[in-house]
Regions:
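Gly/Gly-Pro-rich "capping" loops immediately C-terminal to redox-active cysteine motifs
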Residues: 45, 61-95, 115-120
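The canonical Cys-X-X-Cys-His
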Residues: 44, 48-58, 113, 128-132
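Axial heme c-ligation environment in periplasmic c-type cytochrome domains
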Residues: 68, 78-79, 97-126, 135, ...
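Electrostatic cytochrome c docking/interface patches
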Residues: 23-47, 142-150
Length: 150
């Protein structure tokens, strides 16, 4: 092999390795919640406190009387703790509702909750879902998984 061919092979090898590292980094972003991942949960808690707590409560308690419509006809922000119905939804539904807002998913449903697609990355949304799920007791987590599996 000539020196020029060796050099070209080395360059191609470096490019391939670099591309592989880049793909590995891209895959490191969460594509599902992981309520047992302390780092992801901490990230989710920080994002929740900044973006969600003003409506859903700093303790995930939701707004008072959340089961009854507001004067504008819309529903108050529900709790995300075990007393609410968040755990009745699949992980994908929780992600989608956060990303595009409930109104975009349910035809005719009006909600004060906006979608966060322009404010949060997908990884941030999964981190928030991870944080919320991390606060649920094991029996609620298990019920959510059983209820929402296809």
């Amino acid at each position: 092999m000539t020196a020029k061919i060796r050099r070209v092979c080395c360059i191609l090898l470096l490019i391939a390795v670099g591309a592989g590292v880049g793909l590995g980094a891209a895959r490191a972003e969460p594509i599902a919640p992981d309520p047992n991942n302390a780092q992801l949960v901490a990230r989710g808690k920080a994002v929740y406190e900044e973006q969600c707590a003003r409506c859903h409560g700093s303790n995930l308690e939701g707004q008072p009387d959340w089961r009854h419509r507001l004067p504008n006809g819309r529903m108050p922000a529900p709790p995300h703790d075990p007393t609410g119905h968040t755990w009745h939804h699949s992980d994908k539904q929780l992600f989608d509702m956060t990303k595009v807002g409930p109104g975009a998913l349910v035809p005719g449903y009006q909600s004060d909750m906006p979608g966060f697609k322009d404010k949060l990355s997908d990884a941030d949304i999964w981190a928030v879902v991870s944080y919320i799920e991390s606060t649920w007791p094991p029996d609620i987590r298990a019920k959510q998984q059983r209820m929402t599996r296809p």
